[in-house]
Amino acid sequence: MSRIGKRPISIPSGVTATVEGQLVKAKGPKGELSYVVNDEVLVKFEENVISVMPRDQSKDARSKWGMSRSMIENIFCGVKDGFEKRLEINGVGYRAALQGKDIQLSLGFSHDVVYKVPSGVTVTVPKPTEIVISGIDKQQVGQVAAEIREYRRPEPYKGKGVKHADERIFRKEGKKK
């Protein structure tokens, strides 16, 4: 039994939701999103509350039950408040700068890395060592943050690289004589 899936989803104020078969649409102050729920899961819409139930008690249906509920809740949070991820850049000479809509990263390579920002996501660089990624789609914001971090992951000896703002790097001790 999914403990996450059992909880009903209340629609926040300022957000309108429609359910058409397996398609859930949400429209709010930040924009509009939709999510196609898996066929194994049944969606019911009653008076500002959406409930999600598995069609049968198979293991496959129950495994998709909680995920579907979380995805629907994420689209409501996204169109109301949006999502934001912060990245920090550590290292001598490591920096980021906006170049039009793209982001230019100096990460210690012989060339600068230019990352093309997809539509639906906005990237700002308040400081050369900080990147703020925001948008209404949680998956897309996280994907952009992961792709930028992947160019130079933080290394464990000095902590140089791109890391999430709330991430702790496990530091190792260097060689001993």
Swiss-Prot record:
InterPro entries (UniProt xref): Ribosomal_uL6-like, Ribosomal_uL6-like_a/b-dom_sf, Ribosomal_uL6_a/b-dom, Ribosomal_uL6_bac-type, Ribosomal_uL6_CS
Coiled coil segments of this chain: none
Subunit record text: Part of the 50S ribosomal subunit.
GO biological process: cytoplasmic translation
Protein name, UniProt field: Large ribosomal subunit protein uL6
Example GO molecular function: rRNA binding
Chain intervals for the UniProt region annotation (Disordered): 155-177
Gene Ontology cellular component annotations, sorted alphabetically: cytosolic large ribosomal subunit
Keyword RNA-binding: yes
PROSITE patterns recorded: RIBOSOMAL_L6_1
Keyword Transport: no
Keyword field: Ribonucleoprotein, Ribosomal protein, RNA-binding, rRNA-binding
Organism: Bartonella tribocorum (strain CIP 105476 / IBS 506)
Protein family per UniProt: Belongs to the universal ribosomal protein uL6 family.
Role according to the record: This protein binds to the 23S rRNA, and is important in its secondary structure. It is located near the subunit interface in the base of the L7/L12 stalk, and near the tRNA binding site of the peptidyltransferase center.
NCBIfam families: L6_bact (TIGR03654)
One Pfam family matching this protein: Ribosomal_L6
Stored SUPFAM superfamilies: Ribosomal protein L6
